[in-house]
UniProtKB/Swiss-Prot annotation:
Region (Increases helicase activity about 5-fold (in a fragment starting at residue 427)), start-end ranges: 1117-1208
Source species: Homo sapiens
Keyword NADP appears in the UniProt entry: no
Short name of one Pfam family: Drc1-Sld2
Designated name of the protein: ATP-dependent DNA helicase Q4
Lineage of source species: Eukaryota, Metazoa, Chordata, Craniata, Vertebrata
Entry similarity comment: Belongs to the helicase family. RecQ subfamily.
The entry's keywords: ATP-binding, Cataract, Craniosynostosis, Cytoplasm, Disease variant, DNA-binding, Dwarfism, Ectodermal dysplasia, Helicase, Hydrolase, Hypotrichosis, Isomerase, Metal-binding, Nucleotide-binding, Nucleus, Phosphoprotein, Zinc
Length: 1208
């Protein structure tokens, strides 16, 4: 015993010295970092304490019990002998409810374990009404802290004791030693079962034991502390057994009113010196004051916690127990004035029923919910429950109808399905800085990949279509397959990527619905459908059969709607997920693949967008397949399109990794029941009215008119409403619609677009005047006519538009109004030239993407090949680009730089290069898909961060100690920087991430957590006043910095060559489209009023068929050649002098501007750009759109000569 006291005194002296030197108590890490002599003392202290406890109760009980027996206080008028607990109470029965109070548990504990050592009567019980328990479990414990010993262990093995003089050894010590010998001779298993039954009340899972200490469950007096058991002056086991459960009440306690949930901080351990110091605050310690420290675990030693017991009792879980947080606070209020908390009566389980006292009348006093307020509250509760159905989240505050452990409404806390290990983890640890999201149902562990449903034959052939496929076909509402559907479905079910080209209305959607249904039947999985338009997604979701559950994710959804959809996806309640390419590629669209069910296959609807829309319009299409393979682990793709030439099909097949097959195409691109006609009228508006009033179109009740510009849709719709309302006579089988014509374009709000489309689908609208945004995915079979006011941009667009008519097989009419002088062709050329750029702008972009660095580290060749700037297999490119890439696909040099994360602010880059954002992103995608893999394009992010501290520089420096990114940012600033002593700091997020080597999301999360802190006593989350702002959206990429000048020139040539090739192809496509329609056009619409011309219609269908069947390399060039100018253009020689004069005048009017030759040509053609917008330069009609009839490239040449002349 002397050795134990000596070791304890030496450890206390070391801890006091540590506290004086460091200003804080030593932690577990400090003990581990202490000298070997100190650590040896801690180990010896632990060993001596364990040996003493096993020998018969320890030093505390062997010395204090004789003093309690021999030095009993004399009876006085007032004293502890008058307490109610001093009277003998009947012993509790073994079958007492678990919901007894803490004193009741102490009574049973003493009766079983220390029955022979009792020095006083047992404690009595007093009925006490139960209060409401805490409705929120504690937060998870951070890593690195050891488990906290349970209260049952402390009471049973090492009971604490009040400071008292050490008595002399007496007879009671010998009785205790003999008792330990007798207990040692018994069966250990029987003893363990006896011990485990007694602390069963506290051995339940922590999540099922609400914290003791709420205002509703304790009787507290301000300024005093409450202890369970006898008074502070009593001696014996009663005082020692419950000394640790005293509660400090001097500070405000957390309340449960107003939706606030109680939380408590925990102390991981307390050293002997800490307990002695806290217990001696009320007065000078006595001789045995250090005895309390013997029972505490030394810092640095792990404590073994009891395994949690399952909460199997079906009774109400809101009983009063002792939580770990209450144990951590035990002993901190020792020495303060006592306030008794009386034991409480166990509550019988009545389920959800509450007994009402009907004998006493109660009246409402004060504010109450009556009439209007009561109805408003009921209305809020109703819509809160419906929030999930409309995309919103559930109630923000846990209500009494839900489980207070996981806030679910399908069970109570007693039947909570959460595992015991998770409950124990959630009940320990500090409050997180950022509130955690609402718990979602856990997805069962699934395989990362989905195996094909059917295997291939020995020679790679498809298996015969089994019966279950036809059964699923009937379940979807179809009796048989249409041409091309069965083979495509079997290929997907066999795991083979497929490109399916079918006419519009031929049932392409079934080819992904049927495989998705069969895959989901076998195992929980997900089918991704990438769709280009929101209206198309809405139409497809509404048209799905009931057996398929579908959901959408797009940019028009709110955050609550997106979270609701993601929660259903994680719970495997969605079979088909439709999303836009921007939602798939962009940041925040989908969670990581590990949090989602495995993807069976991915369907690219309107797959021709991969080839046509991906360049300078929607560059995300260029990265769709790459993201699906690398991020989502997709191996099987299905491409669906109705308009794809051989060239387009080959390009799409390359993206989808589909082997080329001779039967990629289905039937003819234009159905036989469509009657085509073309006319060239000078007054298009009057010709349209004449055609609609003619015999051929007069009785048609569903017509779609397509225009190239939004302004034309509004104007033509107003014209038709004025002129055709009284002239139109409905057909024999239909009734007159409510409205004659309405406009539809992308500039309208979504509600208005849905209204127009719904009216047209229901037959209440006869004519829709729209742009190409209308009709994609339209499922109305009886569209009788499709008209075009102007030249379509391509054959593919025309075929797709006319394919929306006559899907029911009945005759339908299609007419095209062509401008005789090629005015519409000029407008389409403007869009082509708007996407082109100069070589100088490309070179500036390359310099910004590949800045020089000073990397000196090398990497092994195996890592270099897969990193940025390494090599990878060369994909197949079109013939025009294959020759250009052939000399660039040679193996590059070994890279020294492994790549740096860089950010290009979008707005600044757009202004510096005078290029649209889509054009810049397209060039970056070209570099990412290059065989040399020049860079890795990441999701766009906000790069500029500003952090403002209201507490001044002192608070900023204090935050740097807890936030490593902020510390690195302050360390990188120059000492002479005047902002060093300010209360705010601004920095580049991406540069900071690149210098630290962290992930961008981790740095952003660490900076956002600086805005929140915890109240040190209650753990309630509170704001710190720190403001963290992110701004300046930027392209985020990773590129090497050690490229040579030759490599940069090679990249510039590659990018500029791709831009010129795309421009030539687009101009050639326009030229060929105009020539084809011009060859079959009538001079006016007169011959088309009564009946169609079958001969010209057949000729046009043959031209379209040959265009779609052409092989690669047969497409002619599109730039001006020696034969003459393009259609619709004048000769430059006739206008050269006037053009030069106008260029000089334009430059002289704006001498402060630094124009390029392309900028001057754009203004003369009426093409706006970021640096020269149409809103500013379009006001000067002397130059804007003046030379639209001349060649754009000819204007660029003349402007270059004049700029050089001015520079001289």
């Amino acid at each position: 015993m002397e050795r134990l006291r000596d070791v304890r005194e030496r450890l206390q002296a070391w801890e006091r010295a540590f506290r004086r030197q460091r200003g804080r108590r030593p932690s577990q890490d400090d003990v581990e970092a202490a000298p070997e002599e100190t650590r040896a003392l801690y180990r010896e202290y632990r060993t001596l304490k364990r040996t003493t406890g096993q020998a018969g109760g320890g030093l505390r009980s062997s010395e204090s019990l004789p003093a309690a027996a021999e030095e009993a206080p004399e009876p006085r008028c007032w004293g502890p002998h008058l307490n109610r607990a001093a009277t003998k109470s009947p012993q509790s029965t073994p079958g007492r409810s678990r919901q007894g109070s803490v004193p009741d548990y102490g009574q049973r504990l003493k009766a079983n374990l220390k029955g022979t050592l009792q020095a006083g009567p047992a404690l009595g019980r007093r009925p006490w009404p139960l209060g409401r328990a805490s409705s929120k479990a504690s937060t998870p414990k951070p890593p690195g802290t050891g488990p906290v010993p349970s209260f049952a262990e402390k009471v049973s093995d090492e009971p604490p004791q009040l400071p008292e003089p050490q008595p002399r050894p007496g007879r009671l010590q010998h009785l205790q030693a003999s008792l330990s010998q007798r207990l040692g001779s018994l069966d250990p298993g029987w003893l363990q079962r006896c011990h485990s039954e007694v602390p069963d009340f506290l051995g339940a899972p922590k999540a099922c034991r609400p914290d003791l200490g709420s205002e509703e469950s304790q009787l507290l007096i301000p300024g005093e502390s409450a202890v369970l058991g006898p008074g502070a002056g009593s001696q014996g086991p009663e005082a020692s057994a419950f000394q640790e459960v005293s509660i400090r009440v001097g500070s405000p306690q957390p309340s449960s009113s107003g939706g606030e949930k109680r939380r408590w901080n925990e102390e991981p351990w307390e050293s002997p010196a800490q307990v002695q110091q806290e217990s001696s605050q009320a007065g000078p310690p006595s001789e045995g004051a250090g005895a309390v420290a013997v029972e505490e675990d030394p810092p640095g030693e792990p404590v073994q916690a009891q395994p949690p017991q399952p909460c199997s009792s079906p009774s109400n879980p809101r009983y009063h127990g002792l939580s770990p947080s209450s144990q951590a606070r035990a002993g901190k209020a020792e020495g303060t004035a006592p306030l008794h908390i009386f034991p409480r009566l166990a509550r019988h389980d009545r389920g959800n029923y509450v007994r009402l006292n009907m004998k006493q009348k109660h009246y409402v006093r004060g504010r109450a919910l009556r009439s209007r307020l009561l109805r408003k509250q009921a209305w809020k509760q109703k819509w809160r429950k419906k929030g999930e159905c409309f995309g919103g989240g559930g109630a923000t505050v846990t209500t009494k109808e839900s489980c207070f452990l996981n806030e679910q409404f399908d069970h109570w806390a007693a039947q909570c399905p959460r595992p015991a290990s998770e409950e124990d983890t959630d009940a320990v640890g500090p409050e997180p800085l950022v509130p955690s999201p609402q718990p979602v149902p856990e997805v069962p562990s699934l395989d990362p990949t989905v195996l094909p449903l059917y295997s291939l034959g020995p020679s790679g052939q498809l298996a015969e279509t089994p019966a279950e496929v036809f059964q699923a076909l009937e379940q979807l509402g179809h009796q048989a397959f249409r041409p091309g559907q069965e083979r495509a479905v079997m290929r997907i079910l066999s795991g083979i990527s497929t490109l399916l080209v079918l006419p519009t209305g031929a049932g392409k959607s079934l080819c992904y619905q049927l495989p998705a249904l069969l895959y989901s039947r076998r195992s929980p999985c997900l089918t991704l459908v990438v769709s280009p338009l929101l209206s198309l997604m809405d139409d497809q979701v509404s048209g799905l059969p009931p057996c398929l559950k579908a959901a959408c994710i797009h940019s028009g959804m709110t955050r609550k709607q997106r979270e609701s959809v993601l929660q259903k996806i994680r719970a495997a309640q969605v079979h088909v997920l439709m999303l836009t390419p921007e939602a798939l590629v962009g940041a925040g669209g989908l969670p990581p693949a590990a949090q989602l069910p495995p993807v069976a296959f991915a369907c690219i609807d309107e797959a021709h967008c991969l080839s046509q829309w991906s360049h300078n319009f929607r560059p995300c299409y260029l990265r769709v397949c790459k993201v699906l393979r690398e991020r989502m682990g997709v191996h099987c793709f299905l491409g669906l399109t109705a308009t794809a030439t051989r060239r387009t099909a080959s390009d799409v097949a390359q993206h989808l990794a589909v082997a080329e097959e001779p039967d990629l195409h289905g039937p003819a691109p234009v159905p036989t029941n469509l009657h085509l006609s073309v006319s060239m009228d000078r007054d298009t508006d009057q010709a349209l009215l004449t055609l609609l009033q003619g015999k051929r179109f007069q009785n048609l009740d569903s017509i779609i008119i397509y225009c190239n510009r939004r302004e034309d849709t509004e104007r033509i719709a107003a014209l038709l409403r004025t002129c055709l309302h009284a002239a139109w006579v409905p057909g024999s089988g239909g009734r007159a619609p409510k409205t004659t014509a309405e406009a539809y374009h992308a500039g309208m709000c979504s509600r208005e677009r849905r209204r127009v489309q719904r009216a047209f689908m229901q037959g209440q609208l006869r004519v829709v005047v729209a742009t190409v945004a209308f009709g994609m995915g339209l499922d109305r079979p009886d569209v009788r006519a499709v008209l075009h006011l102007g030249l379509p941009p391509s054959f593919e667009s025309y075929v797709q538009a006319v394919g929306r008519a006559g899907r029911d097989g009945q005759p339908a009419h299609c007419h095209l109004f062509l401008q005789p002088q090629g005015e519409d062709l000029r407008e389409l050329r403007r869009h082509v030239h708007a996407d082109s750029t100069d070589f100088l702008a490309v070179k500036r972009l390359v310099q910004r993407v590949f800045p020089a660095c000073t990397c000196t580290c090398t990497r092994p060749p195996s890592e270099q090949e897969g990193a940025v700037g390494g090599e990878r297999p060369v994909p197949k490119y079109p013939p025009q680009e294959a020759e250009q890439l052939s000399h660039q696909a040679a193996p590059g040099p070994r890279r020294v730089c492994m790549g740096h994360e860089r950010a290009l602010p979008i707005q600044l880059t757009v202004q510096a290069l005078d290029m649209p954002e889509e054009a810049i992103e397209t060039l970056l995608c070209y570099l990412e898909l290059h065989p040399h893999h020049w860079l890795e394009l990441l999701a766009t992010t906000y790069t500029h961060c500003r952090l403002n501290c209201p507490g001044g520089p002192a608070q900023l420096q204090a935050l740097a100690h807890r936030c490593p990114p902020l510390a690195v940012c302050l360390a990188q600033q120059l000492p002479e920087d005047p902002g060093q002593g300010s209360s705010s700091v601004e920095f580049d997020m991406v540069k900071l991430v690149d210098s630290m080597g962290w992930e961008l999301a981790s740095v952003r999360r660490a900076l956002c957590q600086l805005q929140w802190d915890h109240e040190p006593r209650t753990g309630v989350r509170r704001g710190t006043g720190v403001l963290v702002e992110f701004s300046e959206l930027a392209f985020h990429l990773r590129s090497p910095g050690d490229l040579t000048a030759e490599e940069k020139d090679q990249i510039c040539d590659f990018l500029y060559g791709r831009v010129q090739a795309r421009e030539r192809q687009a101009l050639a496509r326009l030229r060929r489209t105009f020539q084809a329609f011009h060859s079959v056009a009538f001079p006016s619409c007169g011959p088309c009023l009564e009946q169609q011309d079958e001969e010209r219609s057949t000729r046009l269908k043959d031209l379209l068929g040959r265009y779609f069947e052409e092989e690669e390399g047969q497409e002619p060039g599109g730039m001006e050649d020696a034969q003459g100018p393009e259609p619709g253009q004048a000769r430059l020689q006739d206008w050269e002098d006037q053009v030069r004069c106008d260029i000089r005048q334009f430059l002289s009017l704006r001498p402060e501007e630094k124009f390029s030759s392309r900028a001057v040509a754009r203004i003369f053609h009426g093409i706006g750009s970021p640096c020269y917008p149409a809103q500013v330069y379009g006001q000067d009609r002397r130059f804007w759109r003046k030379y639209l009839h001349l060649s754009f490239h000819a204007l660029v040449g003349l402007a270059t000569e004049e700029l050089l002349q001015v520079a001289r």
